[in-house]
Amino acid sequence: MSLQKTPPTRVFVELVPWADRSRENNLASGRETLPGLRHPLSSTQAQTATREVQVSGTSEVSAGPDRAQVVVRVSSTKEAAAEAKKSVCRRLDYITQSLQQQGVQAENITVTKDFRRVENAYHMEAEVCITFTEFGKMQNICNFLVEKLDSSVVISPPQFYHTPGSVENLRRQACLVAVENAWRKAQEVCNLVGQTLGKPLLIKEEETKEWEGQIDDHQSSRLSSSLTVQQKIKSATIHAASKVFITFEVKGKEKRKKHL
């Protein structure tokens, strides 16, 4: 007796990610089950389904201060008002002329004067506030004034700071570098699995952080008078960090057309 042939059957299986598979199977403890089977997507659904890769990117950038301010104080106390004024103005003119000869622009020099009576004498004091963008030039000018002027002229330690525009540029740079790092990561992932990276579908900056210097406030206030110029520049350096999350479209490898 001949055996009756079984009619051919077709089985459609879709590989399901482990997370989906575990949800569908509801695995019981101590018992193994077969991977879940799902109905295949229709050709229309397969074409419209968007494949994507989600990556995060981080960055940390820093920038030193772009401005420094130095204050030069000149004072004189005399019994005669004219003598006090003459003493201060003579040294004040010498300071401003020296600054201009060294290439300091007039808009970066601010002069204030104060004249008052002190008991039976007259006291005059003048301040020259100088803003520098070149720190090497600042040090040369300060050294020159210390050498040429007497002890009645007091030169304050430089105060370093950032202009608002430079801080905003640093924030943008941190975000852009984080986006670039995320794009490179997604590009390498797609190359590894034989796919082509598509356009970004979502770009989100999740976290930003800024901090200044590497010396804590207590230590900085205690040592501010003894810090060197380079240490002050380092403590005034601003750091910015950014973290972004990006979703990219994933395309299949494009097949090269064979030309007949």
UniProtKB/Swiss-Prot annotation:
Subunit structure: Interacts with IRAK1 and RELA. Interacts with HSPA8 and HSPA1.
Entry comment, domain topic: The disordered region interacts with HSPA1 and HSPA8.
Main location: cytoplasm
Cellular compartment(s): Cytoplasm; Nucleus
Alphabetical keyword list: Cytoplasm, Nucleus, Phosphoprotein, Transcription, Transcription regulation
Cysteine-cysteine disulfides: none
Family statement: Belongs to the IRAK1BP1 family.
Keyword match Transcription regulation: yes
Compositionally biased region (Polar residues): 41-50
Phosphothreonine modification, residue list: T237, T247
Function recorded in the entry: Component of the IRAK1-dependent TNFRSF1A signaling pathway that leads to NF-kappa-B activation and is required for cell survival. Acts by enhancing RELA transcriptional activity.
Residue ranges of the region described as Disordered: 30-50
GO molecular function: signaling adaptor activity
Keyword flag GTP-binding: no
Region feature (Required for nuclear localization (NLS)): 240-260
Name this protein carries in UniProt: Interleukin-1 receptor-associated kinase 1-binding protein 1
UniProt GO cellular component terms: cytoplasm; nucleus
Post-translational modification: Phosphorylation at Ser-56 and/or Ser-62 is required for full activity. Phosphorylated on at least one of Ser-235, Thr-237, Ser-242 and Thr-247 upon TNF-alpha activation, which favors nuclear translocation.
Biological process terms in GO annotation: immune response; positive regulation of canonical NF-kappaB signal transduction
A Pfam family per the record: SIMPL
Annotated positions of the Phosphoserine modification: S56, S62, S235, S242
